[in-house]
Curated annotation (Swiss-Prot):
The lineage of its organism: Bacteria, Pseudomonadati, Pseudomonadota, Alphaproteobacteria, Rickettsiales. The chain crosses the membrane at residues 8-28, 94-114, 124-144, 159-179, 215-235, 276-296, 303-323, 328-348. Pathway: Porphyrin-containing compound metabolism; heme A biosynthesis; heme A from heme O: step 1/1. This is Heme A synthase. It is a multi-pass membrane protein. Keywords: Cell membrane, Heme biosynthesis, Iron, Membrane, Metal-binding, Oxidoreductase, Transmembrane, Transmembrane helix. GO terms for cellular component: plasma membrane. Catalyzes the conversion of heme O to heme A by two successive hydroxylations of the methyl group at C8. The first hydroxylation forms heme I, the second hydroxylation results in an unstable dihydroxymethyl group, which spontaneously dehydrates, resulting in the formyl group of heme A. It comes from the Bacteria. Belongs to the COX15/CtaA family. Type 2 subfamily.
Length: 359
């Protein structure tokens, strides 16, 4: 691929990644403001145009009044209040459409112009398919709160968020494959140091770094899933103290074995797991970050410091979110923090894959 195509594709992937990150943020706002069930229909094309006239708004409001959320929770809501939550959900859906178009259309153009390698076609086709599935997944999630209960199914919410994170992950990975920022830097450093050989010890160290980094990425995905389950269950609104849950570190519901441990729909259990699994991952990340810093290789040392700082901020925002009964700003910062930590480890993965170039 020539340099102009690399630059164009890089800009496209950066814009797509930033849009997806914004989508995750707006999705968090939608959840925290309880606006997700304000639009009770899914019209991918005609839904682009919002209500304009008073008649349009009355029609939308009448549709909403037939929903479980209105009948069981918001039956005193005014049309002005309805407009507020409607526009939050509308912006979320509109941004989803824009993000989908920005990802899919350029891919089709690149494919038509034969600017992609075979492997790139497969990877970008996968991303395109995931984006389309995500649109259906969003409606599948919303639909769960429009029938009998005025609540979105928390497992579907977790699936919706995880799919967004997977797409984000794939976009970052594709961007790093194309521009190879760390590899270029390390090649230059390697040539300057006249390094002509790679020892067995270096290869073994590289393998350990790659394996542990992949384990951390998997654990981060798992923790993000638990965070989504906590959000979907409103489990952050119980036991709002730290480190105890009630009178002890382990809540009485668990001590009394009154929880069905095969289920993911118990508020107490989900909050307990999200708390302490998060602490466990944070300790692991800090240890790994210290290791990267001790290795004293410039690219790794910097990323190790970034990872350590981010995880300390993440623990702090998590505790603030819990203790202060889920304030929107703290909760959003906590959600974005998880994505930034994941991004950091995707960058670290790119570095350690070319670790021998540092020697």
């Amino acid at each position: 691929m020539d340099k102009p195509h690399i630059q164009i594709m890089s800009i496209w992937l950066i814009v797509s990644t930033l849009l997806l990150l914004l989508m995750i943020v707006v999705g968090g706002i939608t959840r925290l403001t309880n606006a997700g069930l304000s639009i009770v229909e899914w019209n991918p094309v005609s839904g682009i145009i919002p209500p304009i006239s008073s008649e349009d708004w009355n029609n939308e409001f009448n549709k909403y009044t037939a929903s479980p959320e209105f009948n069981l929770i918001n039956n005193q809501i005014t049309i002005s209040e309805f407009k507020y939550i409607f526009f939050i959900e509308y912006i979320h859906r509109l941004l989803g459409r824009i993000t989908g178009i920005i990802i899919i259309i350029p891919f089709l153009i690149f494919y038509y112009l034969k600017s992609l390698t075979k492997l790139q076609c497969y990877r970008l086709l996968l991303i395109t398919c995931l984006v389309i599935i995500q649109g259906f997944m969003g409606w599948y999630m919303v639909k769960s709160g429009l029938k009998d209960t005025p609540y979105i199914n928390h497992c579907r919410l977790a699936g919706h968020l995880l799919l967004a994170v997977v797409i984000y992950h794939q976009l970052i990975a594709e961007l790093l494959i194309i521009i190879q920022p760390f590899k270029c830097y390390m090649l230059a450093t390697s040539k300057a140091n006249n390094s002509n050989s790679t020892s067995i010890n270096v290869i073994n160290l590289k393998t350990k770094l790659i394996v542990l980094n992949k384990i951390i990425i998997f654990l981060l995905y798992t923790q993000i899933m638990f965070g989504a389950l906590v959000a979907g269950l409103d489990a952050g609104l119980i036991y709002n103290e730290f480190p105890n849950m009630g009178d002890s570190l382990i809540p009485i519901e668990i001590l009394n074995q009154s929880i069905d441990f095969t289920m993911f729909d118990n508020q107490v259990l989900m909050q307990f797991i999200h708390r302490w699994f998060g602490i466990l991952i944070s300790c692991l990340i800090i240890c790994y970050a210290i290791w990267l810093i001790i290795l004293n290789k410039q690219a790794l040392r910097g990323m190790g410091m970034v990872a350590a700082c981010l995880v300390l901020v993440q623990v702090t925002t998590g505790i603030i979110t819990l203790v202060y009964h889920v304030p929107i700003l703290a909760a959003l910062t906590h959600q974005v923090g998880a994505i930034l930590i994941l991004t950091t480890f995707l960058f670290i993965q790119n570095i350690v894959t070319n670790f021998e170039l540092l020697h």
